[in-house]
């Protein structure tokens, strides 16, 4: 057989406790009023896959425990630490005080295209993702240290928040 899918036991999966004991990535995810619990769950799953240290759920974001989050997170809401903040700016202020560089993921006049951005080794980044309708709040953009954007070539120039988070977190993955 030329190619074969891996069996579950061949994937090297760890328990949530073992995962939490692994070295951190220096990446925090901030969800700015993301409306869909499915999207929140999918972001947890990507955060787990790419070893984000924490997810901040802000404003109207659904929070665990939630059957809808669990359905798309597949348990990643238990492996990735999370915090709830009533305002996104509260999370930004906390992360800045902890030494994170705040980067919004948004289409902005001064954004840096993702393919031209290289994360600095050892630097801590807080990646802010906006909601499905309005994106990242302008107040949050103005308070950030920078804006990064995923280059797009189609007619929509619009990716689902969970797809965007997966792409960005892969780009910032450790190693």
Which residue ranges define each predicted feature?
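Post-transcriptional modification and biogenesis factors for structured RNAs
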Residues: 1-175
């Amino acid at each position: 057989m030329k190619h074969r899918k891996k069996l579950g036991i061949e994937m090297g999966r760890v328990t949530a406790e073992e995962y939490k004991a692994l070295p951190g990535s220096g990446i925090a995810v901030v969800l700015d009023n993301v409306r869909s619990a499915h999207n929140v769950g999918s972001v947890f799953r990507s955060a787990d896959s790419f070893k984000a240290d924490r997810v901040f759920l802000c404003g109207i974001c659904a929070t665990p425990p939630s059957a809808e989050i669990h359905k798309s997170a597949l348990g990643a809401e238990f492996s990735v630490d999370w915090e709830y903040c009533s305002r996104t700016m509260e999370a930004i202020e906390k992360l800045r005080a902890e030494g994170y560089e705040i980067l919004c993921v948004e289409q902005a006049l001064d954004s840096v295209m993702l393919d031209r951005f290289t994360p600095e080794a050892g630097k801590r980044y807080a990646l802010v993702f906006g909601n499905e309708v309005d994106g990242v709040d302008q107040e949050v953009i103005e308070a950030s240290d920078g804006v990064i954007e995923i280059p797009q070539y189609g007619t929509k120039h619009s990716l689902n928040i969970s797809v965007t988070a997966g792409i960005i977190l892969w780009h910032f993955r450790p190693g």
